[in-house]
């Protein structure tokens, strides 16, 4: 699930559709590639402008939690029925790669130390919903495929980017990789010297 960007003012019904898709496909793992929560109240790009007025952190958090409620509703309904019938429940492993939008919380507490302890990633309740979180700019490898919100390059730690991002990722990382962040689909396949496809 790439870059869902749950935010106040947007319809979260799309999360129900994604939850239903998960129930139809029944994957062993569900990986969110980050930016589940948009957190516009913590944006540094347009802070201080008239367009920024009215944004509230609490509303951002409530939108992200509502999105999770909607996403997990089909799974919850399914498992309640299975529990009633004493049948095996479906419990996929859930991975949440934190993205740059979730990192807005960390940056806010670093630039305004008085917020430290008052706000945090835990407000989004990811772990309560069963997600195993992967820190921002970190990766997790499942079945030989590495997942991250984005991959970095160079000493500045900037995101790898390109018009042909799939090609750039396999060329720089030399492994099978999936990332979010760009909001675009791109795919490339290479063959390593040992014959393995990446």
Regions found by a protein language model. Name each.
Residues 30-33, 93-98, 133, 147-149, ...:
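A structural signal for short, well-ordered beta-strand segments and their strand-loop junctions
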Residues 6-128:
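Core catalytic region of metal-dependent phosphoesterases/phosphodiesterases
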Residues 2-6, 34-37, 100-102, 150-152, ...:
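Active-site metal-binding loops of divalent metal-dependent hydrolases
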Residues 12, 128-131, 157-161:
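Short gly/ser/thr-rich secondary-structure transition/capping motifs
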Residues 124-144:
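Short acidic low-complexity segments
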């Amino acid at each position: 699930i790439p870059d869902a960007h749950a935010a106040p003012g947007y319809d979260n019904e799309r999360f129900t559709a994604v939850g239903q898709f998960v129930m139809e496909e029944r994957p062993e793992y569900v990986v969110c590639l980050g930016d589940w929560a948009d957190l516009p109240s913590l944006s540094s790009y347009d802070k201080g402008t008239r367009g920024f007025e009215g944004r509230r952190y609490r509303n951002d958090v409530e939108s992200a939690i509502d999105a999770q409620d909607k996403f997990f509703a089909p799974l919850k309904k399914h498992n309640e029925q299975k529990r009633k019938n004493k049948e095996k429940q479906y419990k996929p492993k859930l991975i949440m790669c934190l993205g740059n939008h979730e990192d807005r919380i960390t940056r806010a507490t670093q630039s305004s130390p008085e917020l430290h302890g008052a706000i945090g990633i835990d407000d989004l309740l990811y772990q309560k919903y069963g997600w195993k979180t992967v820190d921002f700019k970190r990766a997790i490898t499942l079945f030989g495929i590495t997942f991250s919100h984005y991959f970095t390059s160079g000493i500045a730690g900037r995101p790898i980017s390109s018009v042909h991002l799939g090609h750039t990722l396999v060329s720089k990382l030399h492994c099978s990789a999936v990332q979010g962040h760009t909001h675009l689909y791109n795919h490339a396949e290479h063959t390593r010297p040992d014959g393995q496809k990446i």
